[in-house]
Regions:
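Specific alpha-helical transmembrane segments that line the substrate/conduction pathway
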Residues: 35-46, 75-76, 84-123, 242-262
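Juxtamembrane helix-entry segments on the extracytoplasmic side of multipass membrane proteins
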Residues: 2-6, 29-34, 38, 61-67, ...
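Specific transmembrane alpha-helical segments of multi-pass solute transporters/efflux pumps
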Residues: 15-16, 20-24, 49-100, 136-137, ...
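Helix-helix packing/entry segments at the starts of transmembrane helices
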Residues: 38-39, 96-102, 169-193, 223-262
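Juxtamembrane helix-loop-helix junctions in multi-pass membrane proteins
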Residues: 15-45, 92-95, 165-191, 205
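Membrane-interface helix-cap regions at the ends of transmembrane helices
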Residues: 19, 23-26, 30, 44-62, ...
Length: 297
């Protein structure tokens, strides 16, 4: 795939994932946090199942494989899906988007904790410390948590911790299966949708008379943010490598800040964009973006 082709997917992915936080806000106009979590996973699963059907890709087989997919869905979709939606009843979509950019730090921490072979390198420790500083600036720790809700902020950090824990598990248990990415993603989201269905039935809908834009936002969150986005991500990995694909995490907080400010009129405090830049720099450093191949070895 030529650079222009993967670059188009890269920009689309950054925009869609960056807009996910405003889509969550819109979904909360008529759904509960559990309803938002179920809606995005159900719509994403339906989208991926249709894509798999068109491409004649079969779903994974075997109880062990489905159990692993269920565990991954808990960590990537069910728990963080609920926590992000709950958090956005307390904090702005801008803050949620910025904290989400801390996911690489959580991933590194869990890799160090769970792997006996991987030891932290000096540049990774430096990146983690710089990232922690950036988070402190974003939250305005010199004045408590600024205007942020304590429970909302805690929920955000629990959510990205789930993301961080999921990646070592995926690498250890799912990657060796050598299944097609579309098959894994469809199975993962299907497991998540089944898990969340009872919570949606019990208390998933707050009201039925929401604005049309709220329904549109929920559709976009599920179909694109949790469905088609997986396909874009796989295409970028195949065409440009995982390093380029993971760089989209630097674009999403920028998009989240801009759309939250422009379309929702959310207030941006001076420390949030500055802290976000520090977080992005720390994440890039921790991922070895500024190191030569010799230094990474």
């Amino acid at each position: 795939m030529k650079q222009k082709s993967w670059l188009f997917d890269f920009v689309l992915l950054g925009i869609v994932w960056g807009c996910s936080f405003i889509f969550i806000k819109l979904g909360l106009e008529f759904l509960t946090p559990a309803g938002v979590a179920f809606g995005r996973v159900f719509l994403g699963a339906t989208t991926l199942l249709l894509i798999a059907r068109v491409k004649n890709i079969s779903l994974p087989k075997g109880l062990r494989t489905w159990f692993i997919l269920w565990v991954v869905s808990l960590l990537l979709n069910v728990i963080p899906g609920f926590l992000f939606a709950y958090a956005e009843t307390k904090v702005t979509s801008i803050l949620a988007g910025i904290i989400n950019a801390c996911t690489p730090f959580a991933t590194l921490i869990f890799i160090f904790l769970l792997s006996k072979d991987e030891k932290p390198k000096s540049f990774q420790i430096q990146g983690l410390l710089i990232g922690a500083l950036g988070v402190g600036v974003v939250l305005g720790i010199w004045s408590g948590l600024g205007s942020g809700s304590t429970s909302g902020v805690i929920a955000l950090f629990f959510a990205i911790s789930c993301y961080g824990l999921s990646f070592p598990i995926i690498k250890r248990f799912l990657m060796p299966l050598n299944l097609k990415p579309e098959s894994l993603a469809a199975g993962q989201l299907t497991s998540g949708a089944i898990t969340l269905l009872p919570f949606f039935i019990i208390h998933g809908i707050n009201k039925y008379d929401a604005r049309p834009i709220a329904y549109a936002g929920m559709l976009a969150l599920g179909i694109f943010g949790s469905g088609v986005a997986y396909i874009w991500n796989f295409r970028i990995v195949a065409a440009a490598g995982s390093a380029i694909a993971s760089s989209v995490t630097y674009l999403t907080p920028v998009v989240a800040v801009l759309v939250g400010w422009i379309f929702l009129g959310e207030k941006i405090t001076w420390n949030e964009p500055i802290g976000a830049l520090i977080v992005i720099f720390g994440a890039a450093l921790a991922q070895g973006r500024f190191k030569s191949s010799k230094q990474l070895a």
